[in-house]
């Protein structure tokens, strides 16, 4: 049984001074203006996961040292405190900065499966779609156990699904069908292994309807390859208990954003989904209760889940079709309060 996050508390972490007993649902669409703290909320998931994976101090060192994680720095904040409740189990910690720019860690656990759930969290970021991006390169066929955060192993992962028995094949076919909705000319992935010395590698080759010519990853637009990665993450047969996706809307056509929303909804039956976005079109696809507004309040990040009392105002915004700044302002995202 998947262990989703029911509630979380985090204090003193970056722009998040005090977020207490905040509830997460199956779908959590976090929207806010630049600087509201969405990225810090996303990074919190990475940090907690690395604590459980025992790679925490290296994570802190490579991201600026302890002071970079404390709300307004060492002088303002003496520690970071957090607690996560997952299906009746819990994990909490206190982080106290040390003289060598690391943290002294005090942890508490209640439950046998909490470490497995947290260590499996994945924060997907498919921002780099450049010609040299990992997702466009060849990767060894053995790198297929799970989809990497930057989709560097998208080709071997898809190849493994296609050869993984009924469950994997079903997932693979669903991914292909989703891609065809966005790219009607798309036929299938080729994924033909090529030997490089002692290793076999595969890259994201594909075919177009009406021809067997093997198109290369560089033939895919930024939006197309990003959507392939998103569809794969959301339709994978054995997802982690919680997945976080940072700004999935980048480079996507409005029609693709609507299809993405359908994939998120379908995935939420099997995994908890947290999405950080600036896209009003993406937000507009979800129920009011799925939306979490991030804004600055008294110099810190505040998160607020919308409810039915907000629905009338949102419906008015939709009818008026405001631009994004107006839309954010009316939600309270652009105001320092």
Q: For each of these PLM feature ranges, what is it?
A:
Residues 246-247:
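Walker B catalytic acidic pair
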Residues 20, 241-242:
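The start of beta-strands in P-loop NTPase/AAA+ ATPase cores
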Residues 1, 258-337:
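C-terminal lobe/lid and adjacent interdomain/linker elements of RecA-like ASCE P-loop ATPase modules
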Residues 51-238, 323-336:
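Phosphate-coordinating catalytic segments in nucleotide- and nucleic-acid-processing enzymes
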